[in-house]
A protein has these predicted regions:
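Short, gly/Ser/Thr-rich active-site loops of penicillin-recognizing serine hydrolases
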Residues: 294-304, 309, 323, 360-381
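Short, glycine/proline-biased beta-turn/loop segments that scaffold the active-site neighborhood
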Residues: 90-105, 201-203
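Short, surface-exposed loop or secondary-structure junction motifs
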Residues: 52, 105-328
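Acidic/histidine-rich, surface-exposed loop or edge segments in extracytoplasmic proteins
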Residues: 1-5
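Short, well-ordered beta-strand elements
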Residues: 340-346, 350-360
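Short, conserved catalytic-motif segment at the N-terminal edge
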Residues: 7-67
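Active-site SXXK
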Residues: 17-21, 34, 40, 63-92, ...
Length: 381
């Protein structure tokens, strides 16, 4: 089938057109959006394939997608902004800011830095990820889902940690929900409002907002999300209604918030990444704060078993790969039912964002992992 492209063709970057049309076709993905920037200039913004398989509407450069965990860099920059303003310290404990006691005494030792670097003490491989544990939360609280982030954090305050805070790295969505509560408490406004004021407004990023779960509540310029297996489930948002496509209410999507709840255009994502191409001129954070964002974590979070530094590690809200002369590649990927996202800032001033309205690669694995090396290769630098 023919994969149509929308947006302006850029003669110097046609390698990306070829890559995207082939990738969308071969992977059997409905649609995708790619934006590329270089040192402060948005050079490329195109849509490929279909935003909605049912209506045949194409993806446009202005189409918004759920960005899943690419939300984390925005949450991280927001909290670092509060650190920069002196409102909170990066090594401050989070518990006093949550305003409730915790069952496990080790909670008192969890810091903001731990949450940023996924070192808080929660390991979803051991105790599961609370963002999907609707049944357990219901049995414990007797409150039916959906759950907002504050309810999920409150539930987890009553659960034991999986390891001593700071001891190691285990990817944790909960840690970012905790950071969302910290932002609201310290800033005195709700999480979304603070991110908008502190992170989005200075860059003129108007497409970003927290998305909605139900089909009827979607934005008019938002892609329609398709899962590979077209699975359905009962809606948490309308439990007595008919089964819904999985992305439209079968997950607790409106509770994802600070760890994975935003929607955006690829162009706005790449403008955000591009703001970090030169630490000295970043409109969001000072160079010393960016150094915190990129810092290698202590212990095995940043080092191999033999003590050697890892080639790549999770910093504050971004994966970090040191390249040379203090220059780094930063990136984050995201995956939820019906969408995937990848945002990359390279050390040499190039950045890109790619968004899909489906999840999972035809070959197994995920779309962001499959396309990442192809994008670096297409740039040919």
């Amino acid at each position: 089938t023919e994969v149509t492209a929308t947006g302006e063709r850029v003669p110097e970057l046609t390698a990306f057109d070829e890559l995207m049309t082939r990738f969308v076709r071969e992977q059997g993905v409905p649609g995708a959006s790619l934006a590329i920037a270089h040192r402060g200039k948005l050079l490329y913004a195109r849509g490929f394939g279909l935003a909605d398989r049912d209506t045949g509407a194409p993806v446009r450069p202005t189409t918004r997608f759920r960005i899943a965990s690419v939300s984390k860099p925005f949450t991280a920059v927001a909290i670092l902004k509060l650190v920069e303003q002196g409102k909170v310290g990066i090594d401050d404990p989070v518990l006093p800011l949550l305003g409730r006691p915790a069952k496990d005494p080790r909670w008192a030792r969890i810091t903001i830095r731990h949450c940023l670097q996924h070192r808080g003490g929660w390991d979803r491989a051991i105790s599961g990820d609370p963002i999907g544990q609707m049944g357990e939360i219901f049995r414990t609280t007797a409150i039916p889902p959906p759950y907002d982030p504050a309810q999920i954090v409150r539930y987890m305050l009553g659960r034991p940690l999986d390891f001593e805070p700071g001891a190691r790295m285990a990817y944790s969505n909960l840690g970012y929900l905790v950071l969302g509560r910290v932002i609201a408490k310290v800033a005195g406004v709700d999480y979304e409002d603070f991110v908008r004021t502190a992170v989005l407004k200075p860059l003129g990023l108007n497409s970003l907002k927290l998305g909605k779960a139900a089909w009827k509540d979607r934005e008019t310029d938002e892609a329609r999300y398709h899962t590979r297996d077209n699975r359905t489930g009962l809606s948490l948002y309308d439990p007595f209604g008919p089964p819904v496509p999985y992305p439209y209410g079968a997950e607790n999507f409106e509770g994802f918030e600070a760890h994975g709840g935003w929607i955006a255009t690829a162009s706005d994502l790449v403008r955000f990444a591009d703001a970090f191409h030169d630490s000295a001129k970043c409109p969001l954070l000072k160079p010393e704060t960016i150094a915190l964002l990129q810092a290698r974590p202590d212990g095995n979070a940043g080092h191999e078993a033999d003590g050697q530094p890892k080639a790549a590690y999770y910093g504050a809200g971004w994966m970090v790969r040191p390249i040379k002369h203090g220059q780094v590649n930063l990136w984050h990927s995201g995956l939820i039912a019906g969408s995937e996202a990848l945002l990359v800032k390279r050390w040499d001033g190039w950045s890109w964002a790619v968004l899909f309205n489906s999840n999972g690669a035809a070959t197994g694995g995920n779309l962001s992992g499959a396309i990442d090396p192809l994008l670096h290769r297409a740039l040919g630098r």
